[in-house]
């Protein structure tokens, strides 16, 4: 499966259903009155983390995802059915950004509400009053939220395997865990992070095999920096180093990887670390091991042969033991605080000599919610706009009979007594 760790997409909550206008028509029931039901709620969109997914590939080509709309209200005070919510499965460790601000960090086993659906509109039963026993008024359902998002995956693994190309990371992962990575005798066999679940005698944990690092990885060379970010949440860093091949220098390999980690993020050097000396089955292993111990006498080294699986079970238990004492680095990334901006209810913009536009979310939402389908609805909208000061502001702009006033998606023809829908 192709590894994709960053995608952009647009999510749209479902629209609420429209409220109904209807009246009781039953035998032996005089003056039955209104019985129009409310519209149903539009569907929300949730992200649900799944341990079985470790790529954003499924979302790469889903540029727009829409939740379902709520049903319209019906006669006999029947409410419209609320829409089913839309669940999108994502990998654990997915970061959700809107306008480059972090809004969610998917690290817990629960559903995350990302986009809300619209509310259902009221039916005419809700508008009944002592003064108006038969109202011809209703509401449209509101639109759902719309968000343009960037998703970035930072894999959640307990242990990160790092090393130079061809150090044996993929082979080790395949014998340690249930993972089946591609294995070859050439550099960069692993082109993307591979996750595996390891079960030791008394614990289980996840381990990630990161593509081989080369000098300059922290500056973007090779495959390095593209995947170094995936080690940021690992609690333990396990260096797998080739100690057996004649043309390899374990000391240089270790120092090179340390330097790339330091250049990328020096706090990575504070993590619990283990040296895994691989290729014990080769003849130069002991010589290289002795030289390494002299250079780094305080480092903990565990000897294995991933190819023959020698000491692999012992390594499983050792990693589990180290992990039980390691500090957690799975702190949730702090979300960016939302700045509350107080905006005007509306603003009048003169487009031409006889054309004006009223802009402002409160006003456009109001016009969207009140249908232009009955005289009473038109009067209700007119009164609300008047009470909010819209008409007074337009008069200041010398609006005249016959001029056009655009509000939201609608255009009204101005009349000194009342605006009528064009």
Curated annotation (Swiss-Prot):
EC number: 3.6.5.-
Cytoplasm keyword on record: yes
MF term (GO), any: magnesium ion binding
Cofactor field: Mg(2+)
UniProt GO cellular component terms: cytoplasm
Domain OBG-type G as annotated: residue spans: 157-324
Compartments reported by the entry: Cytoplasm
Transmembrane segments: none
Domain OCT: 338-416
Family to which this protein belongs: Belongs to the TRAFAC class OBG-HflX-like GTPase superfamily. OBG GTPase family.
Assembly and binders: Monomer.
PANTHER family: DEVELOPMENTALLY REGULATED GTP-BINDING PROTEIN-RELATED, MITOCHONDRIAL RIBOSOME-ASSOCIATED GTPASE 2
UniProt name for this protein: GTPase Obg
Organism of derivation: Mycoplasma mobile (strain ATCC 43663 / 163K / NCTC 11711)
High-level lineage: Bacteria, Bacillati, Mycoplasmatota, Mycoplasmoidales, Metamycoplasmataceae
